[in-house]
Amino acid sequence: MLAKAMSLLMMFLLVLVIGSVMVSADDAPACPVGTKYDDVLKSCRSLLELQG
């Protein structure tokens, strides 16, 4: 039960991170949003792998 709650919390935090990345991409046009989004996806995959 606790693990399920933790995974839900992590997913919620990732959604917040993705949202903030999309917003901050407008402030920094030098860095394309695609690369930032890929970094977020990679960290999400690694988190899911850690949870098994």
UniProtKB/Swiss-Prot annotation:
Keywords: Disulfide bond, Secreted, Signal, Toxin
Species the sequence originates in: Thereuopoda longicornis
Biological classification of the source: Eukaryota, Metazoa, Ecdysozoa, Arthropoda, Myriapoda
Main location: secreted
One cellular component term from this protein's GO annotations in UniProt: extracellular region
Compartment(s) where it occurs, according to its Swiss-Prot or TrEMBL record: Secreted
Tissue: Expressed by the venom gland.
Residues in the signal sequence: 1-25
Annotated family: Belongs to the scutigerotoxin-01 family.
Protein's name according to its UniProt entry: U-scutigerotoxin(01)-Tl1a
GO MF terms, alphabetically ordered: toxin activity
UniProt modification remark: Contains 1 disulfide bond.
